[in-house]
Amino acid sequence: MSKGVEIFYKGQKAFLNILSLWPQIERRWRIIHQVNYVHVIVFWVLLFDLLLVLHVMANLSYMSEVVKAIFILATSAGHTTKLLSIKANNVQMEELFRRLDNEEFRPRGANEELIFAAACERSRKLRDFYGALSFAALSMILIPQFALDWSHLPLKTYNPLGENTGSPAYWLLYCYQCLALSVSCITNIGFDSLCSSLFIFLKCQLDILAVRLDKIGRLITTSGGTVEQQLKENIRYHMTIVELSKTVERLLCKPISVQIFCSVLVLTANFYAIAVLSDERLELFKYVTYQACMLIQIFILCYYAGEVTQRSLDLPHELYKTSWVDWDYRSRRIALLFMQRLHSTLRIRTLNPSLGFDLMLFSSIVNCSYSYFALLKRVNS
């Protein structure tokens, strides 16, 4: 496996393997990881979801309490979906990672090497930036709460152990909330940066295809082949990129779509909380921090998926810029068919096939969340 290709997923795999999401070869490790996965999903994920649901149901008549819980509940629902989705498709994900190192996706020549190296560096920086940002947001939510007012739990959840501040039961629930939120943070870092890295890889392949299209007809040599041979080779390469894009979409669209839906709930609840709880400085600080992190999370997913679509839109122009007027009739006919196919742009679609992940979707999410917030505030007043 090429070390360059591993940059797109190796760090994220290691991060997610803390939660035992990947298949194991040895029987002993399979048993250990299965036990750890059941422990994580039942105790740290589903139980946490249940406590949040019970708290919301017990406080339906108190809008402020519902809002304080709903933004964490929606986040937890999104990260639960990600965990279950990765575990259910872990074998297919492993096959996808191996496929990235196929000969057909490897760069040829200095220009392509530079494009691939830039994509690797971009993926690494994104992973590190997003991880640092997420841990910083987690720290800003938990540490000020403990330092300034540890008499209140970090999160609003159902408390079956009583409200006796300072008791062992209280600190047990306090630590449980902190660790459960950390599990959610780890999942989001691994999954979101993995999705973005795969989108960067797809965009990198489209950039390489554009370079190869530009070279068609320029080097008619024994090694370079005729124009017709070069066209056929690029058509096959484009077909492999399309197949890879469909595989990525099939594996990722469901959890990302659920994340988008949950994000609308989170943003709406946070808009409302920021407007209503402006007098409670510590609570306001937590909501503003979380709101910023959530917006960046959605932006990253939509932006890098949108880059794939945007680069795909440029490919017909790249083919048209070649010296096709000097080619023979058969080559021009193949080029015309190829150009017609290139007009079918690549899109990473949501569960609704009419929508793709792009900046337009990001704008719609923010506008929709603010509209729901305005409606909620009007109804509540």
UniProtKB/Swiss-Prot annotation:
Q: Where in the cell is it found?
A: Cell membrane
Which stretches are Extracellular in the membrane topology? Answer: 59-65, 149-170, 277-287, 377-381
Q: In which tissues is it expressed?
A: Isoform A is expressed in a subset of 17 olfactory receptor neurons in the maxillary palp.
Q: Name one GO biological process term.
A: signal transduction
Membrane topology, record value: Multi-pass membrane protein
Which of this chain's residues carry glycans? N59
List residues traversing the bilayer.
Answer: 38-58, 66-86, 128-148, 171-191, 256-276, 288-308, 356-376
Which superkingdom, per the lineage? Eukaryota
Keyword Hydrolase belongs to the record = no
What keywords appear on the UniProt entry? Cell membrane, Glycoprotein, Membrane, Olfaction, Receptor, Sensory transduction, Transducer, Transmembrane, Transmembrane helix
The UniProt GO MF terms for this protein read: odorant binding; olfactory receptor activity
Cytoplasmic topological intervals: 1-37, 87-127, 192-255, 309-355
Task: Give a Gene Ontology cellular component term annotated to this protein.
Answer: plasma membrane
This protein's assembly is summarised as: Interacts with Orco. Complexes exist early in the endomembrane system in olfactory sensory neurons (OSNs), coupling these complexes to the conserved ciliary trafficking pathway.
Q: What role is this protein assigned?
A: Odorant receptor which mediates acceptance or avoidance behavior, depending on its substrates. The odorant receptor repertoire encodes a large collection of odor stimuli that vary widely in identity, intensity, and duration. May form a complex with Orco to form odorant-sensing units, providing sensitive and prolonged odorant signaling and calcium permeability.
Family to which this protein belongs: Belongs to the insect chemoreceptor superfamily. Heteromeric odorant receptor channel (TC 1.A.69) family. Or2a subfamily.
Supply the name of the protein.
Answer: Odorant receptor 46a, isoform A
Q: Which organism is it from?
A: Drosophila melanogaster
